[in-house]
A protein has these predicted regions:
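Active-site neighborhoods and metal-handling regions in enzymes and metal-associated proteins
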Residues: 1-430
Length: 430
């Protein structure tokens, strides 16, 4: 059982959610809200199902990531009703409900049927979840304004949520260290993944997302999804982007490790890490997240010039001409919570110069964000530069040398505090 402090924080968390949800129901004219946990759909033409990922609002309340066909009914002035599906089944094991104090805050029911519980005494009901599971239920299905308001309840994390995220970081960092050790010992991508799973005691299907484990040029594929079973003749670099789910909450951490005799690339990794430290320290109340993203591009420009990858252009010119976007094509980060890319990050669309930015808000206490600058050598992005009017400013021989290392990304999970920030990842790494 978790420590008593965490369990006490969870009791407070449930109380906070009850107040937040009752206010949302009041604001939108509903008596109650029925939340589906979801269920894994079946593969077409097969008797196997896809991997199950629980629905965010259900996880927000319960943290029960593996419970399919469960239902949560929120009612004003009453205990939430938690209905769990427990069929009589000799093919599969049933998940056990943890015997923890937070359950006292709920009315519990168990059902052999996957159907929703009977709904009585509510004239205005909303139901949210996968539409395929809501068919035939009374009430308004996934009303847009209400769903947006529910997303907003997840923007500012409770103390319990931050504690869960901190533990998810601690568990993940043990995996990252094991992955680094395996890489330096000459392991393949597949073996590195096994080392990560062993250290985190987590199956692939239980992870918050598929671990990205790229060796050498594979580190330049942003969401590289395969694992080579044979190690390369020379292991020059490792990029691992991997997390852990703890009580429903996700960590999302990236580290880049260099092999021996990679002096130029190692210097770039060190330079990007120093930039990442500075960017993390920018996280504070009142800071526009877009400003952190744009600051990153100027930092990337300085690294490119210092490394001799480009010359003859100022940092301002490298940014304004779009050269840095070829080396750093994604956003600086996103919200983090019960989903890796947590909700409500883009109340306004990202600007044209940052189309992939997942967070466009001014930071406030209680928000949790990732800070993940990258510097990559991606042929499809660099070839247009090399053949364009600014190509003569780029050191092609050096670029050719570095492309075999793929790229660099360094990512931490950072809490916005009342006065600045708290870096959960560096705490776990210490």
């Amino acid at each position: 059982m978790p420590d008593t402090d965490l369990l006490s924080l969870q009791l407070e968390h449930v109380g906070v959610l009850q107040n937040r949800y009752e206010q949302v129901l009041e604001d939108h004219g509903y008596d109650g809200l029925l939340i589906s946990s979801g269920a894994a759909p079946m593969c077409y033409g097969d008797d196997q199902s896809w991997h199950f990922q629980g629905y965010g609002p259900f996880l927000h309340w319960t943290g029960l990531a593996g419970f399919e066909h469960a239902w949560l009914l929120i009612r004003k002035g009453k205990k939430p009703l938690l209905s769990l599906h427990q069929p009589v089944d000799f093919w599969h094991a049933s998940l056990e409900l943890p015997q923890e104090p937070w359950l006292e805050k709920f009315e519990l029911r168990f059902s052999e049927s996957p159907s929703a519980p009977e709904l009585e005494g509510m004239s205005q009901l909303a139901v949210v979840g996968d539409p395929a599971l809501l068919a035939g239920l009374p009430g308004d299905e996934n009303p847009g304004a209400l769903c947006n308001a529910l997303d907003e309840t997840r923007v500012h994390k409770t103390a319990y949520e931050i504690a869960c995220l901190a533990q998810a970081n601690k568990l993940a960092m043990a995996g990252h260290q094991a992955a680094r050790d395996a890489f330096l010992a000459g392991a393949s991508e597949f073996e590195i993944n096994l080392a990560y799973q062993r250290a985190t005691q987590q199956r692939e299907v239980d992870a918050p997302y598929n671990s990205i484990i790229g060796v050498n040029e594979h580190a330049g594929i942003l969401h590289y999804q395969y694992y080579d079973t044979a190690a390369p003749v020379k292991s020059r670099s490792l990029l691992i982007d991997a997390g852990v789910r703890f009580r429903g909450y996700c960590s999302d951490i990236t580290r880049t490790t260099t092999g021996v005799e990679e002096g130029r690339f190692s210097a770039l990794v060190h330079g990007l890490e120093q930039l990442q430290f500075r960017l993390c320290k920018m996280v504070a109340p009142g800071v526009d997240y877009l400003d952190i993203h744009r600051k990153t591009h100027f930092g990337i420009a300085a690294l490119l010039s210092a490394a001799g990858i480009v010359d003859g252009l100022s940092d301002e010119e490298l940014v304004s001409e779009g050269l840095t976007r070829a080396f750093f094509p994604h956003g600086i980060g996103h919200f983090l919570g019960v989903q890796v890319h947590d909700v409500a990050g883009k109340p306004v669309a990202p600007p044209a110069d940052a189309p992939f930015l997942r967070l466009t808000r001014t930071l406030e206490p209680g928000m949790v964000v990732t800070i993940e600058p990258g510097l990559y050598f991606i042929p499809s992005l660099l070839e247009p530069l090399l053949s364009g009017p600014l190509g003569h400013h780029i050191n092609r021989p050096l670029l050719d040398e570095l492309q075999g290392c793929g790229g660099i990304r360094i990512e931490d999970n950072v809490v916005v505090t009342d006065t600045g920030c708290r870096n959960l990842t560096r705490e776990a790494e210490a």
